[in-house]
Amino acid sequence: MPTVGCHTDDGVAGMTSSTERSARRPLLRRLGWSTLVLCASVVLLVGLGFLWFIRQVPLVEVTLTRDADGIVALTGGASRIADAIELLASGRGKRLLISGAYRATNSTAISRLNPEFERWVRCCVDFDRSLNTLGNAIETRQWAQSRGFRSLIVVTSSYHMPRAMAEIGHQLPGVALIPFPVVTDKLKAEPWWANGTTTKLLLSEYLKYIFTQVRIRFDPASGITTPAYGAWK
């Protein structure tokens, strides 16, 4: 007589497997939707944060209303150096630090920008060769502390100013920082969204700013809370 036990077992196993697959489908769908919602939320937060960051970037030159003990220029463009030396010459600060200067940047090279700069460079300008914004901030701290400065004018490009103020403020919490943003010609000429290169530059700087704020908050070397850039405006 033929046996049917094996066929019955196969049928039960097949039904069990089908039931398990059916039970897993809602779970997979829920996981898929949760992942989608999470990704959309992250994109939304980053987008809103970027728009906030854009609002912190000055689009016009500012007029200083106070002087400071010292001036620090974070290099990256000749206009920053020129503006910083003009501030020094007008008596806005006692001494200038050009931070992150290229090796070729010296009194002779700066004099080519304007011959009148030479006497100021020879008497009242210091240089350091730091390689990034954190290095700028550390060198600025050492320079300011060695001279007993309690207030600084910070000169850098407008899009770099939020990160520069965060880094320097973290290194020098007891020193008053006065931003002097240098607005690039591209930002003056057209809206940031009209130029792909400018948009990428601002987005890159925004992501670096986020990384800086996270690193500062978890910096084991200090428990200092650094205020957002807008607190200095």
Language-model regions, residue ranges each:
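Hinge/cleft segment of the Venus flytrap/periplasmic-binding protein
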Residues: 223-233
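Acidic/polar hotspots within intrinsically disordered regions
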Residues: 9-10
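A structural signal for short, hydrophobic/glycine-enriched beta-strand patches
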Residues: 53-196
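A transmembrane-helix-recognition feature enriched in membrane-embedded lipid enzymes
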Residues: 195-225
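N-terminal type II signal-anchor transmembrane helix
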Residues: 19-62
